[in-house]
Amino acid sequence: MAEYWDIYDENRNKTGALHRRGDPFGPGERHLGVEIWTLDEQGRVLLTRRDLRKRFGGLWECPGGSALVGEDSRTAVRRELREETGLDLGDAEPELLGTTVYEEEFVDTYAVRLPFALADVRLQEGETTDARLATFDEVERAVLEGAPWLAGPIRERTLPLLPKLRTFRAQAKK
């Protein structure tokens, strides 16, 4: 079944047009994407490995994806985390760290602290092949140094938001 997204203009206004995944974008067209940095109760970060058949296959990232037609980013980030990992945010409210633009995508990056164990993670076939918990310091170094195991877009999108992610982590420890 085809996946459809709302089309936005360069100022993040919905145009009323729809985009089918895999089709080329027109000039100035964008869609909405989300990602979520999920910290467990010890402050470790959930990373998932991309399916080998996907772009950046075999590399690690935080869960995320594209908002479907009619979804806002908060709805999309909840759905993406649940689909890719089986984790449900329940009453937890993810904090929006900021928005970056990557290729034809506005990406809203969120962070959340969630009580879960790695054994709770259920991978989504065709999307994720593995999951692990990394220390915050390990993830921060990977972003700063451009570690070869980290999916490139994650580095590009996280680098400008790293100060906000650090602040979130510090506040979440309290």
Model-derived regions, located:
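A glycine-rich, hydrophobic loop/mini-helix early in the fold
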Residues: 33-64
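Active-site segment of metal-dependent pyrophosphate-handling enzymes
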Residues: 28, 32, 52, 78, ...
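A residue-level structural signature of the nucleotidyltransferase/glycosyltransferase Rossmann-like core
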Residues: 5, 29, 44-45, 59, ...
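Conserved hydrophobic "DFG−1" position in protein kinase catalytic cores
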Residues: 7, 38, 47, 111-112, ...
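Short loop segments at secondary-structure junctions
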Residues: 11, 40-43, 51, 113-118, ...
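Nudix hydrolase/Nudix homology domain
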Residues: 19-22, 57, 69, 98-174
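Acidic, metal-coordinating catalytic segment for phosphate/diphosphate chemistry
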Residues: 1-35, 39-41
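Helix-adjacent hinge/juxtasegments
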Residues: 56-88
